[in-house]
Amino acid sequence: LVNYWLTFNEINMILHAPFMGAGLCFEEGENEEQVKYQAAHHELVASAIATKLAHEIDPNNKVGCMLAAGPNYPHTCAPRDVWAGLEEDRKNYFFIDVQARGEYPNYAKKEWERQGITVEMTEQDLQLLKDHTVDFISFSYYASRVASGDPAEREKTAGNIFASLKNPYLES
C-alpha cells in the first residue's frame, strides 16, 4: 500500500516554464506574471484539497510538496547581487511556504503589490491552505544558479530549464 504522495511535481515550474508547468498560454498584452500567480494559487488550493482528501481516505497517508530546486548564489559579495540571489530563491520557496506553513508569506504579498499583481482568492481558499498543509517537503536538485543585481553585465549560461549567470568559480 502506498502512503507517501505528492500533489504537484515541481510546482514552481509554473513560473519558469508556464506551459509545461501549468498549460498556460498567454494572450497578447496579457500580464503574464498576474496569470502565472493566479494559476499558482489555484494549484496551491488544489494541493490543499488533495492533501485533505488523502488524509481523510487514510490517516496514515503522508502528502508532500515538491520543488524544482537549486540555490541562487550571488555573483559577487556586492549587496545588490546578494539581494538578487535572495529574491530569485524566494520566487521558488514561496510555494513551499504556502504548502508547509498554510499561508502566503509577507514577502510574496509585498512583491505582488510592487508589481501590481492582485491574486483573487476567497476566505475558503485561505482556510483550506491553512488547514491542510503538507507533511513533508521534497525537491529535485538539478544545479545551482548565479544571480546578479545587474544581469545584463554578466555572461549567461543555460542549464535544463533555468537560465542563469555563468559561475566564474565552476568549470563547465
Task: Name each region found by the language model.
Residues 1-172:
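Active-site region of glycoside hydrolase catalytic domains
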